[in-house]
Structure formats: structure tokens, C-alpha cells
């Protein structure tokens, strides 16, 4: 959702992406044998959680240039989007899923400390792969243009 926010124009694509995510979850659970543990009354909180990632990507895109000087903005946007997404999605799941007998703020803090690094790791892998792909396309792009007109 972060990359979609950075690459797609406006906010309209977000609704389609949220629908696609729900369909993917449904298919994975119904036909792929994936556990339905996370599907609960808190599932609806994924919309604002993913929306936060989309918004962070959208904010980054407004100041993007293909220069290393935009790397701090990129990192700040990715970190902020991931943090808000994790707080909203995990917080809602912890508070509203019905999976925890006696939810407390202290226990949520312990769980957040355990799972937030995994969210950062996942985001870093996705964004690292996207950065490598973008660098490869940028390196190949000028060569193709030269050969096409040469």
C-alpha cells in the first residue's frame, strides 16, 4: 500500500486495492488453507491501517526526485506509515478481535514491542526489492533510448 500510494495518482485506487486485499484474504482462507485466525470484528481496521501506508507513500511521492537527497524523506514516510499501520491494525486486533480475555495497554505494549520489528523487517524487504527494481529500470532505460534512436 505504501508503494501504491507513492506510484498511483490520487486516492481512488485505494478503494480498489482494499477490495483486492479482502478478495485475496478470502481466496487464501477458503481455497489456500490459510488460517482465518486474523478474521474478526477488528478486520475492518485494516482499511485505515492500509490507508495510513497509502497516505505515507502519497506524501513521499509529492517530494520525490530520483536523487539520494530524497532518501531521508523516503525513510521517514516508510517508518511513519509502517508505525501507524501497525498501531491501528494490531491495536484494533488486540482490543476488538475477542481473541484476548483481558486486554490491557501494558500487554499491548509488550506485543507491539514483539511484532513491530517484524513489520519493519517486512516493509524493508518490500521497499528494498522495489528500490533494486527501480534502479535496474533506471539503468536500463537510457540504454534502450540510445539504441532505439542510434
Predicted feature descriptions by range:
Residues 1-54:
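Alpha-helical membrane segments and adjacent membrane-interface helices in multi-pass membrane proteins
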Residues 4-11, 52-65, 132-141:
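Structural signal for the C-terminal ends of transmembrane alpha-helices
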Residues 63-150:
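Membrane-embedded alpha-helical hairpins and interfacial helices in multi-pass inner-membrane proteins
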Amino acid at each position: 500500500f505504501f508503494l501504491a500510494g507513492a506510484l498511483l495518482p490520487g486516492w481512488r485506487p485505494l478503494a480498489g486495492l482494499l477490495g483486492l486485499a479482502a478478495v485475496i484474504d478470502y481466496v487464501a482462507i477458503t481455497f489456500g488453507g490459510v488460517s482465518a485466525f486474523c478474521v474478526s470484528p477488528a478486520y475492518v481496521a485494516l482499511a485505515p491501517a492500509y490507508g495510513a501506508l497509502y497516505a505515507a507513500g502519497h506524501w513521499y511521492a509529492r517530494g520525490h526526485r530520483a536523487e539520494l537527497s530524497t532518501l531521508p524523506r523516503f525513510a521517514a514516510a516508510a517508518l511513519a506509515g509502517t508505525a501507524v499501520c501497525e498501531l491501528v491494525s494490531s491495536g484494533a486486533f488486540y482490543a476488538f478481535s475477542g481473541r484476548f480475555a483481558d486486554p490491557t495497554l501494558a500487554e499491548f505494549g509488550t506485543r507491539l514491542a514483539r511484532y513491530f520489528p517484524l513489520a519493519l523487517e517486512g516493509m524493508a524487504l518490500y521497499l528494498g526489492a522495489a528500490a533494486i527494481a527501480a534502479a535496474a529500470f533506471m539503468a536500463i532505460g537510457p540504454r534502450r533510448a540510445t539504441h532505439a534512436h542510434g
